[in-house]
Amino acid sequence: KNHPAAIYADKRVEEMYGVWKSGNGQSERSCVIAPDVQCDFTDLPFDDNSFALVVWDPPHLRHIGENAWLAKKYGRLDNNWPKMLHDGFKECMRVLKPDGVLIFKWAETQIPATEVWKAIGQRPLFGHHSGKKSQTFWGCFMKWKDTNDDAE
């Protein structure tokens, strides 16, 4: 998000600081959310066919308190998450150029990726699990020259 060729978009603009107990006593943590463009990923303020590459990392937590550190840092999903992810995926595809690539990051800690693919109406071309428990999934989608209307 800090690369000069990247445009970082998020609906939040926040600076958060906290203290928590760790093995050594107390440690501080901070999180600065400072997007280049403040917007909701279900309604992106970009023209159709604007980008050759989109990286999408939506919130992935449903069962977490509104004021929890992870909710503040990463956002949280509501009960309407399938529609939200469907609409966000559709928007990512809209702003992609034909033959553009969407890299999708999903943490399967609460919702399996298979449920996400059902919600968005497509499966990735390929993907890879990573992280300490292999719960983070990186998926690759492509916008074909004709259309991706099956994501409706």
Where are the regions a protein language model picked out?
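Class I S-adenosyl-L-methionine-dependent methyltransferase catalytic core
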Residues: 1-152
